Amino acid sequence: MTCEQKSRPVQSCQMLPDVVSNEQQSLVLVKKLLAIAISSITYLRGLFSEKAYGRKYVGELKVYILREDSCPGAQQIVHWLQGCFDALQRRYLRMVLLSIYCDPDNPQKVTECYQFKIKYTEKGPQMDFESKNGQSLTKMACDNTQKSSMLLVRKLYMLMQNLGPLPDDVCLNMKLLYYDEVTPQEYQPPGFKEDDNGTLMFEREPVNLTMGEVVTPFHSIKMNVTTEKKRIEPFEDDVEVCVSTKWSLKISEDGMMSETSVQQECMTKENVITDAGIEYSETQETQEQPHRHTKEDFSTNPKMDNLVKKTADLKVDARKTRSGRIFEPQISQLEFPLSQDPQPSVPKRRKVSVPK
């Protein structure tokens, strides 16, 4: 008696495109990155069972995408994403804030927060190559979209697997912020309503991690993660994470979320973990600094290629994220002033939406 062994089919369909040549392709890429990132966060933090996800590939990295018909919670998040996409298509969406909290009656008191900032361009991003005397030498269009997308997803997976566990029972919330100068005051995405509360509070001292940015000729998306400091497991023994005794997180006029220490005790230092590609940034900022791309950012990098190639089938220990660690009752505030002016006599309300 002979047996025929069936080989597992090779995944040929990739989620992300190789080339982005028009605005529609760019829009699809940003939508997919949002869906991948938010689905990956819920999967790697153990918020839903594995049956709630379908499997896709980003390069050689297997990712888990929420399926709308799998469970009510997954269906709700998919509906949130559809609301995000509506605002994104209209070029209204400025930022998506995905927060994790423990008290169902107090969604402003969070334990973890993920920020996705969106920008739109007309002629496509350009990067300047400058000489030592500051003179611009040349310009070229950014065309490394797929590689930067793969690296951003990989960084997210590596970070999620090195974070300490969440409490047993947690909830999700989403806030949407807009470009107020172009967004009609009456506009609300499907499934969202206006939010009157502009403050988030952390139970323990938070730390911000800058994950990275993906740039296309028509959009850019930047991702940051804010979590409790003691939840971060160091990648290296000599890594220092800059902290302060009390934090405020503000949204400036251009939508940049800047962190400041009330007691001015934060070290103005950046620590870059080269192996994981994750930047721990705690430098005090009051406004967004323009990011200057260097030639190395977009040139062929063997080390970067190696990081992408060795990321297939990262294993996840779901129990690690659900162990119910007990937190001390320390409070840190993240304040989101709804003002577009530095010191207005009567503050203007910045438009913010939350799910209905």
UniProtKB/Swiss-Prot annotation:
Residues 288-298 have a biased composition (Basic and acidic residues). PROSITE patterns: HORMA (PS50815). It is found in: Nucleus; Chromosome. It comes from the Eukaryota. Residues 24-225 form the HORMA domain. Disulfide bonds: none annotated. Residues 282-305, 333-356 are annotated as: Disordered. Pfam families: HORMA. Keywords: Chromosome, Differentiation, Meiosis, Nucleus, Oogenesis, Spermatogenesis. SUPFAM superfamilies: The spindle assembly checkpoint protein mad2. InterPro entries: HORMA_dom, HORMA_dom_sf, HORMA_MeioticProgression. Transmembrane segments: none annotated. GO terms for biological process: meiotic cell cycle; meiotic DNA double-strand break formation; meiotic recombination checkpoint signaling; meiotic sister chromatid cohesion; oogenesis; regulation of homologous chromosome segregation; spermatogenesis; synaptonemal complex assembly. GO terms for cellular component: chromosome; nucleus. Gene3D superfamilies: HORMA domain. Residues 347-356 have a biased composition (Basic residues). Plays a key role in meiotic progression by ensuring that sufficient numbers of processed DNA double-strand breaks (DSBs) are available for successful homology search, promoting synaptonemal-complex formation independently and playing key role in the male mid-pachytene checkpoint and the female meiotic prophase checkpoint. This is HORMA domain-containing protein 1.
